[in-house]
Curated annotation (Swiss-Prot):
The gene is rpl14. Belongs to the eukaryotic ribosomal protein eL14 family. This is Large ribosomal subunit protein eL14. SUPFAM superfamilies: Translation proteins SH3-like domain. The keyword Ion transport does not apply. Keywords: Ribonucleoprotein, Ribosomal protein. It comes from Dictyostelium discoideum (Social amoeba).
Amino acid sequence: MISKFSLFVEIGRVVVINYGEYINKTAVIIDVLDQNRALVAGPHSGVERHIINFKWINLTPLKVNIQRGARINTLIAAIKAADLETKIAALSAVKKINARATKSNQTDFERFKANLIRRKLNKKVSGEVKKLVNIANRAAHKKAVAQKAAGHVKKTL
């Protein structure tokens, strides 16, 4: 049977912490302690080596090649060898976290300017949609008139 899961909890898996002291930071699983907890460390993001519950982490597709229970210096070397910093920055989860942080740090005037830009864009899009609908309606009307003239009237309810 083929599994529908593609991400597994394993040694070296990069995770994003979603709860607690290190929220929105990335770490690497160093050891799996039991069915609920793992030992993680994130020297690249300031996460100290500690035990964390699986409910507090989100798995990412990235994986570092390390041994079980690796020391911090070994982990740092593996992170540098895998060029993990750039790969982490390209993750969609990290991009969402950064976007949410910048949006929450906006001033009132910046929110106002963004709202104006959004309104202007929506007005352009809705105008183009109206033009396309109008063209489609005209074509349908011409087709109906042509069919009526030919004697093929199709009634719709």
